[in-house]
């Protein structure tokens, strides 16, 4: 079982803005320049498009879906759409 050392969350359902960057490399003693290995995004009534890290690939998350990535390091993700309700949780593994 993995141990998580830092957790990030949207603190409930939020509404996106276009090109919104969620960056996990913020300075936050004692875990500076953190990246996450677990990312869960839940959408509600509208689909959502995101990019991970600095990749050009676009990931499409359908409306009312749960999207989970737990096998790569993620420094940040970028939300491409505005006005979409979503929730996220991300964790870094120890």
Model region roles, listed by residue range:
Residues 18-19, 25, 55-56, 61-66, ...:
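Tight coil/turn sites that cap or link beta-strands
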Residues 35-39, 71-86:
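Noncatalytic modules at the cell exterior or secretory-pathway interfaces
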């Amino acid at each position: 079982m993995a141990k998580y050392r830092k957790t990030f969350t949207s603190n409930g359902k939020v509404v996106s803005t276009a090109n919104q960057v969620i960056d996990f490399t913020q300075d936050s003693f004692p875990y500076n320049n953190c990246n996450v290995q677990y990312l869960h995004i839940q959408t509600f009534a509208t689909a959502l498009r995101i990019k991970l890290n600095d990749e050009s690939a676009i990931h499409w998350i359908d409306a009312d879906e749960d999207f989970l990535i737990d096998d790569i390091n993620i420094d940040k993700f970028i939300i491409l759409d505005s006005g979409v309700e979503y929730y996220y949780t991300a964790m870094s593994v120890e």
